[in-house]
Each structure stands twice: as C-alpha cells, then as structure tokens.
Amino acid sequence: VLKKYDGLPTIVTTHDYLSANNEKKSVPIIDFHAVDARHNNAQMLWDKLISQHSQIFMVLSGHQHGQGLLIEKNDFGGKVYQIMADYQDRGQSGIDAGQPIDPYTGRPVGIGDGWMRLMTFDFSGSVPFVEVSTYSSHYLVDANHLDNYAAWYRRLEQPNMTDDEFLKADSYTLELDDFYSRFGSSSGL
C-alpha cells in the first residue's frame, strides 16, 4: 500500500509501540519478538518500516497505560510524530460508584472512564498543526476542564510529572512544520 500510494501523507496505527517514557519499547511480558523471532518489536517496526518510508509522518499507538510523545526524523530527514495514549486502566468512575480498590494491586479496577484522544488537523495556515486533546465520554469533559484530573490519574501513570506536565501531556498542539515541504501545499488536501 505504501508503494502504491507513494508520497501520500500516511499515519500508521499499531498496538504496542511507544511507552509512557517516550521509548519505542514493548511491554516486556508480551514482547512477541522474544518468543518468536518472526514478530517485530517496536524498534524493529521503526527500523524496518516507519523510518524507511518518507510519507509516514505519524504513528499512533496504545496498550501501555498513560501517554507518550516522541518526535524523531526518518531516514529522509522528515519528522515522525509518534503518539501513545491508553486510558483503559483508569478506574475513577468505579470509585465514584462505590467500587472498592483492588486489594491485590492497590489500584482501582480499570474500566477506562471513557477517556479518548481527539486530534483535529488544521491545514488552513502557512504551517499546519494538530490539536491533541483528551475527552471523557463518561465525565463529558476535556481533561483540561476537570479539576481532579491530575489528582485522579497522575500518581499511577506518570508519578514523576508535575500536575501541570501531566495535563500538558494530554492536551497540546503539534506544528507540522515540514509537512508542506514534504507533501505540497494545502491546496490538495
């Protein structure tokens, strides 16, 4: 598909690729490459596929709890925005409903709390950008407008971040500053 549509801006979606520490690293207990050499781990996916195709400008992944962002240049010098978001382990809504903390893990039972990533692409200006936000269909609010957001989730997901850093990891703008030089102007979008 990449060869057939060479030059078309491409976003790759995959499962276990980026960690909450912004590393291309699989969860060790399910690193399929360690079990079967035919499987590719995250670094191999970068080395064999993503970095080798100039049209790939973004990678979206999940699986590892929390959020991550890594921006690197591919073998052609183009930026690749690698974004991870996974909220399935969140359980504040269960706590709100009276569900006890899991006695074995010391964590709420993860049901996700309806959190999802929203990405709005804007190609109207001289530099295109992506607005990234995090919204809960349960709480019906964006993460930046929920007073308890960092208090509920930061400790278990990103304990080394400040509350402000944690909020910024779930709501930010990415300028796609090399997009037009790679793919042409907005007239074709």
Predicted regions, residues:
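Internal, well-ordered interaction modules that form the hydrophobic cores of assembly/scaffold domains
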Residues: H53, H63-G66
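Metal-dependent phosphoesterase/phosphodiesterase active-site architecture
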Residues: V1-K4, G66-L189
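Extracellular/periplasmic head regions of type IV pilus-like filament subunits
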Residues: Q55-L60, Q82-M84
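Active-site-proximal segments of metal-dependent phosphoesterases and phosphodiesterases across multiple
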Residues: L2-F57
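Divalent metal-coordination and catalytic microenvironments
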Residues: V12, H63, M119
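Active-site metal-binding loops of divalent metal-dependent hydrolases
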Residues: H15-Y17, G62-Q64, D86-Q88
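A short linear-motif detector with a strong N-terminal bias
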Residues: A37-N40, L60-H63, P108-V109
